Amino acid sequence: RSLASTEFTYNQATVSGTATFVGDEHAALAVLINRVANLIAQRTRRGAGNWAVVSPASLTVLQSATTSAFARTTEGTFEAPTNTKFVGTLNGAMRVFVDSYASDTTPVLVGYKGSSEADAAAFYCPYIPLMSSGVVLDPTTFEPVVSFMTRYGYIELTNTASSFGNAGDYVGEIAVQNLSFS
């Protein structure tokens, strides 16, 4: 989340216009997500943001918004080791994931991932997926333990002195404040 160069705030208490009910105020979050996605397209010249990671509270807001075109997924569930799950699409183009462990005030993260592996904000490159040490004795407790090791490379291209320093252009963040469901 520290990579995001665009930061907006969704504050439900300051949503303008006359809302008929709370779902009208919730629609402003979907509009703001689209705004950040389009700013990503403007900065990268590649495409609009095509994925978002939201908290369970922000997901509820998207699901209850009146004019939002959020469609729940009918695909199988994707459970990552971090418990980030694919939950649906927004406006038919943006894949929405939920971080089940996120608090209600966790910002919405919007990003772009292109069709090639080099068209992204950051790169995770495992070159030894997982190695086991075998069973060894813990010297303090004398219990048998197994340790696992990995070797990998992770890079964010953030040096703005070169043309590769545009990783922050691929990601935007929306702070969430004063959510109300009534």
What annotation goes with each model-predicted range?
Residues 1-28:
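Extended, well-ordered alpha-helical scaffold/bundle regions in very large, multi-domain proteins
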